[in-house]
């Protein structure tokens, strides 16, 4: 049980969602494994919001994500569907058939060297077949990290990572993984590539009952379920599955928050015409249907556009990443997600998912954009007011919702989180009598500094802000993306490169109801209206009718019109 926490159940739907989710859960796990000499005080974030306690059949306590994960056949690599900690009693049921048995064995995937190293560090498989996990402090997380006894971990290489399960370091509950065997992850045939295919999966009693059983298992053990967060691929058939799942949650758990993160890998190439057309159609159908059944929907992508015209991926001054690698893109988006979800994971004075959605989605604006500064440019010799002044009047975060350049747009409401700055740097340290460079330097607390800065940037915007000491953990298997000018804890240093591995970083993240969505959704509708659907009959054959397309197009235009105001190019 969560012991008074406002629990959240996560649904993770799709393969790119798996990459983002694996990094997300690894970061949660790293936050649990706090070093014994950590300077930041524990307890700002409540892990029980996302995790559940349980016991193996041998009585050993476990702490696993409250997660339902759906992916296709071939996506698990060497990870077992029932997980590695313990087996479900149903899975251990005796076989009643006494006749002759024929065994069919599939070729096993070789275990990734990183995961082999992880397992040897966490426990051993004893001679009686029982997995013996090494001692867990306070029943949660892995043993404390100490350099004296812990060998340097094997770092996964980009070449060794084929699927998200190759670098997931978190043990899952047997009820977490639900495989869809009628479609393949690999190969060109049998792919889940259209919205209608995804919708039809949850119309089949087999998969619908399996999802409902898992939902009931997790929900019934919660003391106070605040809602659901859905990590869902938008570009393929999982957009339809996600829409159907959101509809199910809305029907069965009325009044609970449903926040959907629509995930898009990037970039895409002009030469892949059918793939791009399907991506356009799936994204349009997904956004419309997900917004109808969710409290809030946020597209997440490092791409520059939702439409057919490709735009360069976004850039970060202190990161170097390969936008073609899901391993890299997933890490960056997970870091943003770990920051913008802070309000409903706080231990003290949390903002519920429902209240966060209500603050952002007024007047029908259920779609929001995300942005983040990764890492936030903290300099040891500067205070937060100094850093914010240097950012100037430009938008202080990189856009992460494929809505293009935010210049010339306005914000209707926003939720902003800044995490990972030492308290000593929250306010100005100027000597008494020194002229103040800005009103920010007169603020008494870091919370006042951040709130006043946001008010200066967007004077008439409904705004909520949080300032945390807890940084974002970026230890292996998080990829090495950071500038050589960063310290171990993500500060920007002067002089020669340090050569030190970055283990944690400060991050600024935001969710915004932005007029940039007027342009982005409007352009998406224009691209959709220009399609000759006779050329893409295979998409329609998957269960989508012509009337469905016309209705989606109209809904998309109506959704875009909700965001008129402040943009220099509104929808016609």
Curated annotation (Swiss-Prot):
One example of a Gene Ontology biological process annotation: mitochondrion organization
Keywords from the named record: Cytoplasm, Membrane, Mitochondrion, Mitochondrion outer membrane
Subcellular location: Mitochondrion outer membrane; Cytoplasm
Signal peptide location: none
Pfam families to which the protein is assigned, alphabetical: Misat_Tub_SegII, Tubulin_3
Gene Ontology terms: cellular component: cytoplasm; cytosol; mitochondrial outer membrane; mitochondrion
Purpose: Involved in the regulation of mitochondrial distribution and morphology. Required for mitochondrial fusion and mitochondrial network formation.
Family listed: Belongs to the misato family.
Name the UniProt record assigns to this protein: Protein misato homolog 1
Originating organism: Bos taurus
Gene behind the chain: MSTO1
């Amino acid at each position: 049980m969560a012991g008074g926490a406002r629990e959240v159940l996560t649904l993770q739907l799709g393969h790119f969602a798996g990459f983002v989710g694996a990094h997300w859960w690894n970061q949660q796990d790293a936050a649990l494994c706090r070093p014994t000499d950590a300077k930041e005080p524990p307890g700002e974030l409540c892990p029980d919001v996302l995790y559940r306690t349980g016991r193996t059949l041998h009585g050993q306590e476990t702490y696993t994500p409250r997660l339902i994960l759906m992916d296709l056949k071939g996506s698990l690599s060497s990870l077992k569907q029932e997980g590695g900690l313990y087996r479900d009693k149903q899975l251990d049921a005796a076989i009643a058939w006494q006749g002759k048995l024929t065994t069919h064995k599939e070729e096993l995937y070789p275990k990734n060297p990183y995961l082999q190293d992880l397992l040897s560090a966490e426990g051993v498989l004893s001679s009686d077949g029982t997995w013996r996990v090494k001692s867990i402090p306070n029943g949660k997380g892995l043993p404390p990290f100490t350099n004296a006894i812990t060998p340097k971990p094997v770092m996964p290489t980009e070449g060794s990572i084929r699927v998200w399960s190759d670098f997931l370091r978190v043990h899952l509950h047997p009820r977490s993984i639900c495989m869809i065997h009628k479609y393949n992850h690999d190969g060109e045939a049998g792919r889940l590539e259209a919205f209608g295919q995804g919708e039809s999966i949850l119309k089949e009693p087999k998969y619908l009952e399996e999802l409902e059983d898992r939902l009931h298992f997790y929900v019934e053990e919660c003391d106070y379920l605040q809602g659901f967060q859905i990590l869902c691929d938008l570009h393929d058939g999982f957009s339809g599955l996600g829409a159907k799942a959101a509809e199910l949650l809305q029907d069965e758990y009325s009044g609970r928050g449903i926040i959907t993160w629509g995930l898009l890998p990037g970039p895409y190439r002009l030469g892949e015409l059918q793939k791009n057309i399907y991506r356009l159609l799936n994204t349009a159908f997904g956004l419309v249907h997900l917004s109808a059944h969710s409290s809030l929907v946020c597209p997440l992508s490092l791409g520059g556009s939702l439409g057919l015209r490709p735009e360069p991926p976004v850039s970060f001054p202190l990161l170097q990443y390969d936008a073609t690698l899901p391993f890299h893109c997933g890490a960056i988006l997970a870091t943003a997600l770990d920051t913008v979800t802070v309000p409903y994971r706080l231990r003290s004075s949390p903002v519920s998912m429902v209240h966060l959605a209500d603050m952002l989605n007024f007047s029908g604006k259920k779609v929001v954009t995300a942005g983040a500064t990764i890492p936030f440019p903290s300099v040891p010799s500067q205070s937060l007011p100094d850093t914010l002044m240097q950012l100037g009047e430009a938008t202080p975060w990189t856009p992460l919702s494929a809505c293009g350049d935010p210049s010339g747009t306005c914000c209707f409401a926003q939720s902003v989180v800044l995490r990972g700055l030492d308290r000593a740097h929250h306010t100005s340290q100027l000597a008494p009598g020194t002229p103040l460079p800005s009103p920010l330097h007169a603020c008494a607390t870091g919370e006042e500094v951040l709130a006043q800065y946001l008010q200066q940037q967007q004077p008439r915007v409904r705004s909520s802000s949080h300032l945390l000491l807890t940084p974002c953990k970026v230890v292996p298997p998080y990829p090495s993306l950071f500038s050589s000018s960063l310290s171990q804890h993500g500060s920007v240093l002067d002089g020669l490169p340090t050569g030190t591995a970055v283990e944690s970083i400060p991050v600024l993240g935001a969710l915004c109801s932005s007029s940039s969505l007027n342009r982005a959704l409007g352009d998406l509708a224009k691209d959709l209206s220009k399609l000759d659907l006779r050329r893409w009959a295979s998409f329609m054959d998957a269960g989508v009718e012509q009337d469905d397309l016309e209705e989606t197009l109209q809904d998309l235009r109506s959704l875009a019109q909700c965001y008129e105001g402040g943009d220099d190019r509104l929808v016609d």
